[in-house]
Amino acid sequence: MTQIRRGFYGPRVVAFGGGHGLSASLSALRLMTQNVTAVVTVADDGGSSGRLREEFGVLPPGDMRMALSALCDDGEWGQTWRDVLQHRFMSEGPMNGHALGNLLILALWEHFGESVTALDWVGQLLDIKGRVLPMSSTPLEIEAVVDGDGGRTTVRGQVAVATSTGHVHHVAVIPKNPPAQAEALVAVEEADWVILGPGSWYTSVIPHLLVPELREVLRTTKAKRALTLNLNAEKETQGMSAADHIR
């Protein structure tokens, strides 16, 4: 299954990010190349993803589900499976709020015992234009030091950091120095372009640079690199200029 995406045409593009920002980037990139690889953050701790992560001890699947959906084509097959993958159950019971795609990814992870093979199988089912990979094989936590009205505090968790109203002074991932997904390193090394963002700056973009192997391959790759910033500032980047993002 790891070889099913060879032979694509167009430039080799790797997109870093997570959530809605990465989804928007992938929706545009798939119109320009079929050789696109999404490298997705694995620190989500909210909603359906957070519940599955806590209960099963797996990578949070939600951002990968969104990336897979974004790479579906515009035909009936692609759009039907996109909608099915994104479908959320509404009930009074424990299934409430779960996305079907999260459950499908979880089932394939348990079946294969390996995340990349499972994601490739979902990609084949959806006939996506590209590939989706986790940035690390280990679920991560985000921890930030935030300067707010009450002084400097430490905030832990993707949701908590993303909704923080203070100025983020420092951000880290736990565990420290996590392993990068091997296939992601190869994709960056062989890429023509690497795109960072758009998305939540401290919780979807910066975490990729806190994985030492990813940071190093991004530094040494011969690929051109582009940074895409959000059109509107989020709470975690309120008051930051474009230059502030790259200092």
Where are these regions (language model features)?
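Active-site glycine-rich loop that binds ribose-phosphate moieties when present
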Residues: 170-185, 209-210
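Catalytic-core regions built around general acid/base machinery
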Residues: 187, 210-221
